[in-house]
Amino acid sequence: HPGKLVRAMIDTLPKNVQLFENAPLINWKKNNDIILCTFKNTTIKTKKIIFATNGFLKSLKIKSNYNFPITLTASMTRSLTDEEFKSIGEPKEWGVLPVRPMGATIRMTKDRRILIRNTAEVYNPFQMSQLDLNKRKLNQKKGIKKRFPQLPDDIIDSSWSGIVSRTRNSSQIFEKIDKNIFAAGCYNGSGIGVGTLFGEQ
């Protein structure tokens, strides 16, 4: 589950890393050799920075003509009961991935949850109302029920949306854009694996 992954990453941050939650970067500028980052309630001054904002690089006016954000929405069921799990054949953990980068994906997790993502759209996730999210959740429930009609209607436990960054030629960004300023992003749906790989090199 993405939430568990993020919490685990936060819990293992090194002591020299500070985390600021609910603090989106509003603006940034460079004066001489000082980079000034403006947040909602504070500012940070630094001499070096890596903008690792992936799909939000464009909103920071970084590589604006190179990448574009796409909103994906996913849903995950609660853990299936013994009876429900038996009704679908008691499968081992599995996943079906799309041939195309933005195609649908569905997975069965070790703890008997079904995860489905079958929406990819140009939509601002910060403006997605609960009503809009519920519409996408209904679409995903239909997808699960089409394959597993024996499962109950209240099977979905959580739904969420997020941003991936796409480029026309499916290449990533990890480069120096100015003195002491670097940008990382455009993983084209490859996510944490590719991001980590670029960060380590």
Language-model segments: residues:
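Mid-domain beta-loop-alpha active-site segment that forms a flexible
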Residues: H1-I10, P101, R136-G143, F198
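Short, hydrophobic/aromatic-rich segments at coil-to-beta transitions
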Residues: D33-L36, P91-K92, N180
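A conserved FAD-binding loop/helix module that cradles the flavin
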Residues: F126-L133, F182-Q201
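Hydrophobic/aromatic beta-strand patches that form the interior of the parallel beta-sheet core
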Residues: F20, I50, F182-A184
